[in-house]
Each structure stands twice: as structure tokens, then as C-alpha cells.
Amino acid sequence: MITTIPKSINVTTIPLSGKILIEASAGTGKTFSLTILYIRLLLGITNHVKYKKGLLIKEILVVTFTEHTRAELEIRIKTYIKIFKTACIKKYSNNYVLSKLLSKITDFPKTIDILSKAENSIHELSIYTIHGFCYKILKLNKFNSELMLQNKILKHTYPLYLKISIKFWKYYFAFLSLDITSILLEYFNNPKTLLKEILPLLNKTQLISKLTKTKRKNIVQEYYILIKKIKLFKQKWANYSHLIHSEIIKTNVNKRIYTKSNLKRWINNITAWATQKQTKNFFIPSELKYFRYSFIIKKTTSEKILDDKFFKFIDTFLDSKFSLKEIFIIDASLEIKAMFMQEKIKNRYFEYDDLITFCWNMVNKNNFNISQTILKKYPVALIDEFQDTNNKQYNIFKKIYKKENLLILISDPKQAIYSFSGADITSYLQAKSNIKNQYFLDTNWRSSPKIINSINLLFSRLKNPFLTKNITFYPVKSSRINKTTKFEVNGKNQPALRFLLNKNKNISINEYKEWISITTAKYISYWISSGIKGNATITISNKVRTVNFSDIAIIVRNNLEAKTIQLELTKLNIQSLYLTSKNNIFQSKEILEILWILQAILNPNIERLLKRAMSTNIMSKNTKEIISIPNNHSYWIKLSQEFNQYLIFWNNYGILYVIQQLIINYNISNNNNLLHNFSPNIKNILYIGELLEEKSITIKNKFLLINWLKKNITQDFYLTKPKYIKPNYEKNNYIKIVSIHKSKGLEYPITIIPFATITFNKTVSTVEKICFNLNNTKIKKQKTLKIEKHKFSEDIRLLYVALTRSIIHCSIGISLAQTITQKKKIQKEKSKFKINVLRYIIQSGKNHISTKKLYTELSILKKNKNIEIISEIPNIIKKNFQIPTLNTNSQSLMHYQVSRKFNYNYNFTSYSQLKKNIKPSTMYSTLNTKKLFELNVKKKHCFENKILTPHTFPSGKIYGTLLHKILKNISFHKSINSNWLLKKLSEYNLDKRWCLILKNWMYSILYKNLDKNYNLRLSKLDSKNYIKELKFLLPIKKKLTALKLNNIFQTHQCSSLENKLCFHPIQGILSGSIDLVFLWKTKYFLVDYKSNWIGNSNQSYSQQNIKKIIKKHHYNFQLQLYSLVLHRYLKQHIKNYSFYNHFGGTYILFIRSINEIPSQNGIFYSIPNIEIIKKLEQIF
């Protein structure tokens, strides 16, 4: 361990070698500093000989932890390369840091040339998320690359976990008695609530691994042990209860608590419980605590109770843990995780975090070779947001970048708030302790001097504000450029921090929430209305402008807090948007109403459906009107005509047009308002219309479209791909409400933190205790206090993030009440942290809950001119400043911009659909009616005589599909499962006698020598070297016409089409799948199976005959398309790919003719025409 005092950093001069840790407080220019270091490495402005020549853009590795940050870094690096190049051309920059960097340049033409080359190769930027980097590294290894291709990424684990939890729930409870089941159902009433509790543990693989090694208790045995304890106690109480009253009276116990009536009632209640015939659960009367030895001693002046043995026994009894929750959680976690892993292996899934595990295993086991390969590819690495790392992630980089190899770690441990997603502050602190070169950024470039000084004051009053030894708070300096930054209302300069103080000492949590929400709404209303009049202004960079909606952000913890605030804002006509909200449109109230209306449009003559549609809030008909529909004939006709008209609109103009007409006809206004819970939301309705319009491109059948909608409504939220509501507000017309976690990295001129005085993390959960115990096996005493400290420390970091979002002003809600939280029972281990984090910081870390102490500390803070304490809300703020309502009713629909542009000719098509449109006159020109009749007679005769051969196997599309399924599912190396095959025959209503014929037929196909020169047989293919049914999508670049394709094939006679293709122009995507792609002796081949019936003998499948069939059915066109797919795939995956060296050719296997007879009948081999492929590439 290295003890280091971090130094203030100058990013233009810092030596660049070895491991470097840079801690960057909020607003200190972390990303800008990273870009300067990047440019230095690019230009070789470094003291280290190794990097003096400069590095290529692809050699500088940048890793971060979220896709959003990755994208931001990419933009910033691109921008500053361009900016610095311009500065080099001018030999001047008004940016202080860039001007310092310019002074380091000795050869400007060379520098400009390097930066120009960097700009030209900007697409080679090596910026990744941690998962993206691990994936890239794994692909360096051929074996892992194949592994990645074979497995499927499991993007969302919750649906699979939920499915497994339901399965676990069923079998676990099946073997438990009703009594134990009843106890467990008190903890969790269904699999979802269980999964919600254990999910954090399931996501921590290392802890699960540790848990498997611990000794597990049997839940049934533990139940009977605890029941036995309770029975024993009951027996002792029954024996001793008649003496308890007299023993208590003998002591000098507090008579105001232990009154005669209280004693009598308590003893009677406990005795009634103790004398019950049966003991089935863990219920213990709450009155028993009054007879604990420890409790009585506190309430008496006596030194000793006369006979204390029984009272001490009560103490011991109540200290026992009468719960099966922990055992159940451990059982559930281990079983569900084991089943989850089985499913992953079975379905060949891998999670994003598996990439990190795979990468660590590879680097750790094959350390030197792979590390050298990575070092050669990326000589330096910059890791952003390093505080969000964990042990495994850091160890990967530690293994690769040893000794003098440059590894720059940029972080802010004060903003480490993502423990729920796997980040581990302990890992960060451990890594920090091993790094010698530590620096910190000392200037805040974001906020006003007043905000900076106020936050410095708050956190500097504590020696260790974050409760963790190595998380140090360094006061930051303000930048001169922000000296004039200010917020004024009616000519009065607003303070940096304003504490909105509620002086009611007995306020409840709901009362406080209501009070602070109203106060927040009124302040915002006052600022906005003053801004509209020009009386509220913001000055940033010497530019003055009026306060607008977009300047204000309310920072909350969760969705409930956001809704509480939104309710009060709505009352004052203030639109707001919770930016963290993920409301699934399929769970909205409007979606079901749209479904009912569309069902009625498709069935306008069904009274039931029509009535249901009219009952919706969208159509808003009252009960009387709905009931009268069948009796009022003229109204019924009118209504039917209206719905028929909607159907015509749907057919002619699309479903979105229908929904727009509904909004106009029924005058739906924009009630995007929490006060109108039953009013339809116009923006939700239009968004639903957009989704349906988009889906109708691929689902043309209206009834199938309705079924798709119904399925998405009824399916579990987590088991379907959610479509999140995207409000269409103008940027400047709403107040932003954002969660603390989502606000990290963002900035706002004015912020309000209404609920900071409410305790964040209230109680320690069972899962948290299990996780802590597994991580801290050496700690044996006061574990709960340790967990509390850990949680409290994270809460302080959350508060720090919230406070540092502001540029000019921050209002914070606070109360004098002892604690604003729900009343909870006192824990057995007395909590050290009695107050919330805001009070803890204000009170300089003093853990007092007295009102007087808080008021004293606030008075001290008030002396600072940048801080204001408001306990009486000014009268001018109390006035209701109504913000003008925006015109968003149905008549303004003409100005509404639909967020999607629809191309109604855009479609999915396939080879089969294209060839379907061949002109009928040419399609059957070679087969006359007489010939067709003769063929059918022959086939019928074969079946009548019951001769079972591949030639007599039923023909047609259905049976062709069956043959393809069999070939897809059978192994090329193992025997065919007869039971499975019989099941398939049954599904297709075929005689079971076909089973043996089919098995032998399939073996003939697998063992057939396709090429005598190569001795090529499917049975000889290695399972790693082939893919069955390779699905593909080919985007059509421009409009596809039959003429284009016909011209391409016409110019190449060897591939010409016998019949011209004929179809309507198409835009969209061509989809399909290739039956088999395989690698054989360095070359790649594709196979297409054909089950066409040509004749009842092998001679019918001669090369001459099958060539005719291929031309007639456009199979040569199909082969060229498939060849294009394989050609493009190989180009992307093989370095130095050559068509002539790597593309082996194509096979069409007419499988009815393939048997043990040594003949090439039915086997068509060709090498595709590369010129046609090149021309097709211009289309697809």
C-alpha cells in the first residue's frame, strides 16, 4: 500500500508514464482534461521516450463505463483535435490551457500534418465501453471469436430470471407444509416480489460463488428448531407467570410505565398466547419486551431484580432470530442462479458481464502473450469514470499495463453512486492505494464562484465528510470566466444556496412532501412569470437572458417524488417532464381504449364492440347515450356509417390518419395533466398511432395488427420489448425533473432539491446483510452498523452529486423535525446514523437530532452572504402566478409534427415473393394440362401400391417444409432420434411407416459424396465449420425493379433467366435464409435443399433435367442472391479475403434423388458469377 498526498495537476506538463490517477471533482473539466492528454499523446508531447514519436489515433485506448459517456468522449476528442489544429494554423488560442499547449509545439507544419491525419482517420478512434473493449479483446483470440459468433447476447436478464423464479416457486413450495408456506408468504407473496429482493445478489457472481461454499441450513429443520424454542418458552412462561407481577412490583420500577392495569393486561395477553394448544408460526407478543431484563433495568433504580434468571431468559429468547427469511433467500438465490446458468448453457446465451469474466480469464491465464498483443495494439490506455469500476475490471488493466506502461485513470470517488449496477467503491479505493502518481483537478469551470464557495463551506466543515478514509474532499477554486455569473429577480441578486426551512417540529413525511412541493411550484411559477415580464434574468459569460423553463431542473430520488412535484406544478399550469421516466406506452390507459375503438372499426355492426368503443374516454359518450344505441335506429345507422368511414380512411390513408380524425372529431384536448387522470392524453394517442402506422408496414392484415397490439398489452411488461413514451414537448416549455443518478454529469443554471431532508436508505435489508457478511467475513461485531455506515456514505455521495449540478442557484428543502421518515421499530443494534445526510453535513458531522442544534448550525451558515435560510415564505411567492396555457387542443393538430416519416412502399420481401409474380402465361408454358394429369396419375398409383420411397414421399410446400425441418434439426454425426421423427410424422398426419424410410434417406444425404475429387460428404463436416439456416437481411439501397434484375441476368447468358421476373417496384429489405453454409479445405460453400418432385426414378433428376428446373424456377437467381450474402459475410470476417481463394461454390441438392446409388443425379454444383455479384452489390 502506498500513502500518497495527491497534487494539483497541470494537464499540459504532467509526466506521462506508469500508472496515473487523476481525481476530478464535479465541474472541474474532467472530459476536457482527458482530451488534452489525448492530444499530447497524439503529438508526442511527453517526457517518456517511448511516446516521443507520438501515437496513432487507433493506438490510444479510451475506456468508459456507459454508452452515453463513450459517445460524448468521441465527439469531444474529434472537436478538440479540430480546434487545436485551427489554433496551430493561427498559432494562437484564447483558451488558456490550449495556449499553454501551443507553447510546447516546436514544429507547427509537422503538428498540423499529424492532426490532419488524425482527422482523416477519426473513424479509427479506439473509444469503448468496458464491455465493448472486452469484446474487442476476445475477438483477438480466434477461439474466443468463434465462441462469440456461436453464442447469443442476453441483453435483458430479467425476463429469464422471472421465468426461472416462477418455476422455482412452484417446485419449492410443492414439498413444504402449509405452516411453513404461510410463514414464507409473509415475506414474499409471489415470485416477482422474491426476485425483486434477491436480484442484487443474483447479479453479483462472486458473492454467489462464496455463498455456495457456506454451510446451508435446511428450512424444514430450522422451522422445527425455532418452533421447539417457542414451545419451551411458552411452557416456562406458563410455569412462572403467576410470580411475574410480584417480582416486578418488588423493584423500584417506573410506575408510570408499569402500572397495575398495564401489568395485568400484558401478562394476560402473553399468558393467553403461551397457553394456546398449537404453535404453528413465529408470532411473539409485543408486550413481552416489557419483561426483558435489559428493559426493566433501564426503567428501575434497583441494582438487581430479586429473581433475575427468568427475566434474563426472556432477553435471550427475544434475541433469538425467529425467521426463515434468510434461509429462504439463500435457497432461492442459489437455486435460481444455478437454473439460470443451466438455461444460459442450454441456449448458448452470454451476458454483457460475461464478456468481462471471459476477458479476465483470458488475460489471467495466458498473461504474457495476450497482454503483449494488447499492448502492441494499444500502447496507452485512459480509463474514464474509474470510480465506477470493480475489482475484476481493474485487474484486467492492471495485468496488461505493468511498470512504465502508461495507464491514466480519471475518476471522482465523491460521485461513486452506481453500486446497484456492480460498481464497487472498495475496489476503487484498493486500486488507489497502490498508485503512486496521484493528482486532482483544482478549478471548477462550471459553476459560479458563489455556488463553489457555498459547497466548499458545507463539506469543508467536516474532517471526513464521506465517512471513508480515502475519499477526500478538496475545496476547489472558481474560474475567472464565471465571475459575472448571476441570477437576478426584480433586480435582486439571488443567493447561491437557499434552504427552504419548515419549522414544524412534528410534521409527518406526507405533510412535508406536500408543503415542499407547493413551495417549489410557487417559487418556479414566480421565477417563470418574472422571466416572461423580463424581471428574472440569468447572466452567464457576460450574456444576459431571461429565465426560461429550460433553465430549471428539479432533482429527485425516484418516480414517486417526481409525481408529487408534478401534481403541484400542474395546478399552476407548469408543464414538467420526468426525464428518468420509462413509462411503457403499452401500459398506458389510452392504449386499451385505442384497441377497443379499432376492434369496433373492423366490426361496426357488432353492438357489443360498438358500445365498448363509445364508453371510452376518447369518445366520451355518457351511459345514457350508450344504452340507447340499439333503440335509436337513426343514431345506430349514423354510428355504423361513421365507423365504416373510419375503415375507408384506414384502407386509403393508414391507421395514423384514422386516429388523427378521431382526435379532431371528438375534440380531444391535450390533458397531459395529473389533475385529469381520466382524460386521454393527446400525445400518447398520437404516439400509439405512430407505432401502429410503423407496424402496419410489416403487418398488412388489419386483424393480425390488432392481435399484435393485444398481445403487447396483455403480455408482462418485462417479457416484451417496451416502447417508452416520448413526450413531444418543445425544449423550452417544460421544467425538467431528473433523478440524482441520471443527473450525474449534467448541469443546470437553477436546481431545486426538494426532498433532501428525507432519509434515502432507511433500513438494512436481509440481502444487504447477506452481501455484507460474504464480503466481510473477518468482521464479527456490529455488522449492521457497518452496513449502515456503508449506505450512509453512499447517501452523502448522492447528496454531493445533487448539490453540484447547479451553475448559479440551488434551493434545498429542509425541516426542523427530528427525522423526516416513516416510523420504524428501533433495531436491535442501535443505529449510529440517527439523522439524514443533509442534516449530518449541516451539523458538521455531529450526530444529534435536536432541533436546537440544527437551528444553531443553520444560523451559522446564514452568516455567509452566499447562503440564505427562508423559514417564512415571502408573500410575493405565495401568490399563484398562473403560467399561460399552451394551445394544444385537437384543432392544433395541423401543426403537430409526427416524429416518424413513413414510406408506404417500404416493405420486407424475399426471393419467393419476387418469383411469385412471374407471368402465368410463361410460368407453365412447358407443362401442358395433359402432362400434369399424367404426372398426378403416376403419383397416385405409387401411393395406392404403398411403395414407400423418397420418390413417393408426399410432395408440396407443407411436406417440403417438413423435410427442411428434419435436415435442420438432425446431427451430421449422430444417429437420428426415432421418437422425435415419429412425433414430427404425427404432426404432419403421416404414417409412422415413413420413419425408417426417412432415417435411411437422411443418412444417404449425409453420407453422399458430393465431390469425388474432394471426397466431400456432409457427415465429415466438423460441427464448428458449418451453420444451418443462415438468416440474412439485405437492405435495398434504391428502388428495386424487375427490369434492373432482368437486365443484369440478361447480359450474362450463363446465368440468364428463362422467364422474366415481373413484380411491382420495391423498397425495403430482402430477407431469407440459406439452408447450409460450410467450410471445407479452406473454402466456403453454400447448399440449398430442394424437395421438388420431378419423376419417380433417379433418371428423372439427370443434370439435363435439373438444369431445366433450375432455370424455370429461377433457382439461378436465388443462388446469385445467396452467393452475394456469403460473399459479403466472408469479406467482413476474413482478413485479405479473395473470392477466388475463399469462395468454393454453391450446391443445389434435389434430395429425392439422393440415395446409396453412386450417381451424381440431383446434385447441381456451380461457381457463382462474380460480375453478377458485383452488380447486385450496387442494388443491395
From Swiss-Prot:
SUPFAM superfamilies for the chain: P-loop containing nucleoside triphosphate hydrolases, Restriction endonuclease-like
Note accompanying the cofactor annotation: Binds 1 Mg(2+) ion per subunit.
Residues covered by the UvrD-like helicase C-terminal domain: 478-745
Keyword vocabulary terms for this entry: ATP-binding, DNA damage, DNA repair, DNA-binding, Exonuclease, Helicase, Hydrolase, Isomerase, Magnesium, Metal-binding, Nuclease, Nucleotide-binding
UniProt xrefs under InterPro entries: DNA_helicase_UvrD-like_C, DNA_helicase_UvrD/REP, P-loop_NTPase, PDDEXK-like_dom_sf, RecB, Restrct_endonuc-II-like, UvrD-like_ATP-bd
Catalytic activity: Exonucleolytic cleavage (in the presence of ATP) in either 5'- to 3'- or 3'- to 5'-direction to yield 5'-phosphooligonucleotides; Couples ATP hydrolysis with the unwinding of duplex DNA by translocating in the 3'-5' direction; ATP + H2O = ADP + phosphate + H(+)
UniProt record similarity statement: Belongs to the helicase family. UvrD subfamily.
Domain notes: The N-terminal DNA-binding domain is a ssDNA-dependent ATPase and has ATP-dependent 3'-5' helicase function. This domain interacts with RecC.
Protein name per UniProt: RecBCD enzyme subunit RecB
The organism of origin for this protein: Buchnera aphidicola subsp. Baizongia pistaciae (strain Bp)
Lineage: Bacteria, Pseudomonadati, Pseudomonadota, Gammaproteobacteria, Enterobacterales
